[in-house]
Amino acid sequence: MLYAIIEADGKQMWIEPGKYYDVNYIPGEPGDYIQFNKVLVLRQENDIYVGKPCIQSIIIKAKILKHLKSKKITVFKIKPKKNSRKKQGHRQKLTRLLIEEFYNQI
């Protein structure tokens, strides 16, 4: 089993090649390729490599599939005894990435 734990946009993600993941918006056109070089843990077959803090020689190649928005959340603020109400909605922009391959930079 091949998997890696990477840091992307300040968050840690468990990823596997051939699967897609939704992350916070990354500028770029659908079809563009991006690379992640902050690999914290890598597992190949029976070997586990742990970075201190990152594994410098491993790069992960991902393809931008599309941009989308998350589900809408509603924020409703009320101030007691003041008849003050404020309703607000928010949809986070996301980018769907397809993890294509892990490769060694050396």
Curated annotation (Swiss-Prot):
User: Which InterPro entries does the entry mention?
Assistant: bL21-like, bL21-like_sf, Ribosomal_bL21, Ribosomal_bL21_CS
This entry's Gene Ontology molecular function terms read: rRNA binding; structural constituent of ribosome
Q: Which Pfam family is one of those matched by this entry?
A: Ribosomal_L21p
Q: What PROSITE patterns would the database entry show?
A: RIBOSOMAL_L21
The coiled-coil regions, if any, are none
Report the locations given in the UniProt record: Plastid, Chloroplast
**Cellular component per GO?**
chloroplast; mitochondrial large ribosomal subunit
Listed A to Z, the keywords are: Chloroplast, Plastid, Ribonucleoprotein, Ribosomal protein, RNA-binding, rRNA-binding
Chief place of localization: plastid
Biological process (GO) annotations held by this record are: translation
Give the family from UniProt: Belongs to the bacterial ribosomal protein bL21 family.
Q: How does it assemble?
A: Part of the 50S ribosomal subunit.
Q: What does this protein do?
A: This protein binds to 23S rRNA.
Protein name as catalogued:
Large ribosomal subunit protein bL21c
